[in-house]
Amino acid sequence: MTNVPTDDGPWLVVGLGNPGPGYAGNRHNAGFMVVDLLAERAGSRLKSHRSRADVAEVRLAGTRAILARPLSFMNLSGGPVSAVRTFYKIDPARVIVVHDELDIPFGSVRLKRGGGDNGHNGLRSISSALGTRDYLRVRVGIGRPPGRMDPADYVLRDFAAAERRELPLLLEHSADSVEMLITDGLEPTQNRYHALL
């Protein structure tokens, strides 16, 4: 069983981050970066939408998808995500949220459906707004902060120089995993990407 929803409605792929140029290179904006890459691959650009999100209607792996970046700050992502989902009449089972994950080493990608928010306020806001935790997550590993650095400060800093050299590959793997998730379902995608370092 592949866990791919059987209806032919669109997918909603949400990248989490904070809006504005001052946050663009932050670790917390990994989700935005992946959605931007997906839009670029599809030959599209995200544009302002009445749902308080930047949105693009694209085809990913031959399937209709809505890409979205909430224009609220991370902690308030749920409102725009819920508004986009309602506008396009997308089932929560077809929602994929791409976000940074502290507890996964930098360079790794992990996928799951449902579960807790692990202290991620963007996920907490989305779960509350959707009324369910049962949506797909693509978790982009950013690693733990060094020493005693506050994780809240760490996620709001830009990727380090050494990380920036590896970042394009991480974003490519993350975007690839979104497309495979849509075509093949959760378990095959987990089997492929969880085996990578």
From Swiss-Prot:
Query: GO biological process: any one?
Result: rescue of stalled ribosome
This enzyme catalyses: an N-acyl-L-alpha-aminoacyl-tRNA + H2O = an N-acyl-L-amino acid + a tRNA + H(+)
SUPFAM superfamilies, per the entry: Peptidyl-tRNA hydrolase-like
The site (Discriminates between blocked and unblocked aminoacyl-tRNA) lies at: N18
A Pfam family the protein falls into: Pept_tRNA_hydro
The GO molecular function terms of this record are: peptidyl-tRNA hydrolase activity; tRNA binding
Q: What is its main location?
A: cytoplasm
Q: Where in the cell is it found?
A: Cytoplasm
Q: Which PROSITE patterns match?
A: PEPT_TRNA_HYDROL_1, PEPT_TRNA_HYDROL_2
Superkingdom of origin organism: Bacteria
> Where is tRNA annotated to bind?
Y23, F73, N75, N121
Task: Write the record's keywords in alphabetical order, separated by commas.
Answer: Cytoplasm, Hydrolase, RNA-binding, tRNA-binding
Site Stabilizes the basic form of H active site to accept a proton — annotated at D100
What are its GO cellular component terms? cytoplasm
User: What is the active site of this protein?
Assistant: H28 (proton acceptor)
* Stated family: Belongs to the PTH family.
Q: What is the role of this chain?
A: Hydrolyzes ribosome-free peptidyl-tRNAs (with 1 or more amino acids incorporated), which drop off the ribosome during protein synthesis, or as a result of ribosome stalling.
Subunit organization: Monomer.
Designated name of the protein: Peptidyl-tRNA hydrolase
Q: Which gene encodes it?
A: pth
